[in-house]
């Protein structure tokens, strides 16, 4: 199976639309200027091949017309971000996330599931993970629990990694914080996929003890002595 086909399966989402991005110069704030737009029509293997070849960047919309997802992501849009430190925390908390460097140096933390799951459920778990990681204000994809497909809503896309293939700045990080090749990324995704029951069993690197009626991430925050700040989030 080609790399493009594997990425298409990994980032399977909306069949109604996808995203394209043309990257320009990097501004003084460290953020790359870009022209991004939603394009009606299915994301194809051919378009992803162009992405891998560095010709045209593409993005996938996680939520489909039935409000289901097979992947989601946290978008931590901080350009002085210590990627290795954050990646280390992901593994410390035993979160089923794969970190990829974004086009401007931030982090996309991807969650991949074995089957289609309700978008609302994916967003719920990603919200817990964002709080546990200390980034409760970050963007979450999908951005909606539900879309009105009959009115033409399609959702929001997130740029895919490995623009330019292995010669890229949008690479995934392994457990040691080193960049992965595209082939290594494919293998990592296959190992990282989870079911809804797997998500329900997450312990965030510890054992459940208190807050038994609430999100487990509150236990993590409490153990760090910072529960008051977050008590009204959920």
Where are these regions (language model features)?
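Short aromatic/hydrophobic contact patches that present stacked aromatics
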Residues: 71-75, 108-110
């Amino acid at each position: 199976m080609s790399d493009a086909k594997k990425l298409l399966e990994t980032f399977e989402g909306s069949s109604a639309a996808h995203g394209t991005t043309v990257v320009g110069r990097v501004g003084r704030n460290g953020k790359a200027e870009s022209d991004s737009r939603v394009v009606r029509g299915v994301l194809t293997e051919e378009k992803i091949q162009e992405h891998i070849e560095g010709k045209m960047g593409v993005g996938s919309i996680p939520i489909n017309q039935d409000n289901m997802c097979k992947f989601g992501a946290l978008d931590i849009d901080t350009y002085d971000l210590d990627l290795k430190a954050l990646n280390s925390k992901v593994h410390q908390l035993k979160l089923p996330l794969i970190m990829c460097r974004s086009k401007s140096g931030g982090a996309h933390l991807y969650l991949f599931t074995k089957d289609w799951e309700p978008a609302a459920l994916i967003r719920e778990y990603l919200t817990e993970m964002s709080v546990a990681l200390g980034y409760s204000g970050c963007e979450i994809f999908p951005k909606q629990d539900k879309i009105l497909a009959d009115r033409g809503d399609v959702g929001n896309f997130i740029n895919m990694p490995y623009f330019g293939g292995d010669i890229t700045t949008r690479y995934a990080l392994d457990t040691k914080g080193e960049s992965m090749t595209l082939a290594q990324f494919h293998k990592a995704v296959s190992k990282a996929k989870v079911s809804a029951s797997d998500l329900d069993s997450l312990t965030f690197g510890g054992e459940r003890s208190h807050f038994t009626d609430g999100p487990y991430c509150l236990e993590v925050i409490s153990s760090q002595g910072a529960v008051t700040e977050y008590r009204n989030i959920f």
